[in-house]
Amino acid sequence: VLDISAATIGKIADEYYDFGEELTPNVVVTLNGKTLKKGVDYEVAYRDNVKPGTATVTVMGIDQNKGEVSSTFKILPIDITDADITLVKDTFAYTGNAINAEISKVTVKRNGTAKTLTDLTGLTYSCGGNVNVGKAFLTLTAEDGMGFANTATATYNITAASIESAEISADSAVYT
């Protein structure tokens, strides 16, 4: 019979947010210098292990083993500063009104591995500098606590309107 409450859980490395998936890192549990076995000596439960913040791991004795011990690990947000933002369209003709670009896709890196987001939950975007001819920008901003951090920017162009296909009409009048 083991008293798991006297056991030690080894340091659990920080993890990055995993796009809404539960993070369940492996743990090393020792008691009196002996490494215990998951499924034989104990079972593991996780709490608050999806969004950024502090997650809890609880190790509980099974069968005749009793007691429990807990530890924590941090879930870090994914930094979007270097995200690759692809716009549906990146060149627009001047209209005299604000022109807002639309996002086609966003690719971020988690632990150095690129991931294209299919859901932009936790991210908002706004456009600026988007009335006059020149460069306009779209800023993607991470919402607090939603898995991402910081901002990313994409630029797009507003070009002079062409008058080649313009139709001009005027009331008939005599000018002197």
Positions of predicted regions on the chain:
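Serine/threonine-rich, repeat-prone extracellular segments and beta-strand-based repeat modules
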Residues: 33-71, 112-150, 154-156
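Solvent-exposed, low-complexity, repeat-rich "mucin-like" stalks and linkers
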Residues: 1-34, 79-113, 159-176
